[in-house]
Amino acid sequence: MMRGASKRSISSAAVLLIKKNKLPPRPKFTPEMEAQCTEKFLHGGRGPGGQKINKCNSKVQLRHEPTGIVVECQETRSREQNRKLARLKLARELAASYDTMPSREEALLQWHRQQKRSQRRRSVAKYEQREEAARVEKEEREARDREMVRELFRR
C-alpha cells in the first residue's frame, strides 16, 4: 500500500494559480484625487528621527473629502517622502473602498499561501520518500539477516 495515496483528495473546484508577474496593478494617485484632497503637515510624535521629528512638521495628513478617508504618514524624516507615501496609501485605501478590481494585497496573500502550500507538499513528499527508502533498506537488512541465520543452522 502506498503511503501518500490515502491522503490525496480530488476536488472539482477550479484552482486559480497566481503568477508573481501577473498581479493586479498597484493603484495610482491621480490628479483628480489630488483635487479632492486636503493636506496638512503636523508635528510628529512617534517614529524614526528622534528629537528632530518632534520639532518639525514632517508628518503628513491627507483627507479625501468625498469619502472622508484620512491617511497619515510619518515613515521618514523627509516631508517630501512622507507626502509621496501618504498619497500611495490613500490610493490603496480608495481602491479598497471602491473595490473596483481585485486587490493587489489579496492577490499577494493568495500567492504567498500558494507558495507555502507548494513548499509543504514538496517537504512532505521528500520525507515520505526518505521514510520509504529507510523502510525498504531495513526490510532488505532483515531479509539478509534471516538468510544468514538459515545458512548458519543448515550447517
From Swiss-Prot:
GO CC annotation: mitochondrion
Pfam families: RF-1 (PF00472)
Transit peptide boundaries: 1-17
Keywords of this entry: Mitochondrion, Transit peptide
GO terms of molecular function: peptidyl-tRNA hydrolase activity; translation release factor activity
One BP term from GO: mitochondrial translation
Region span, Disordered: 111-155
Subcellular location: Mitochondrion
Predominant location category: mitochondrion
InterPro entries per UniProt: Mito_Transl_Release_Factor, Pep_chain_release_fac_I, Pep_chain_release_fac_I_sf
Compositionally skewed regions (Basic residues) per UniProt: 113-124
Compositionally biased intervals (Basic and acidic residues): 125-155
Family according to the record: Belongs to the prokaryotic/mitochondrial release factor family.
Name of the molecule in the record: Uncharacterized peptide chain release factor-like protein YLR281C, mitochondrial
Organism this protein belongs to: Saccharomyces cerevisiae (strain ATCC 204508 / S288c) (Baker's yeast)
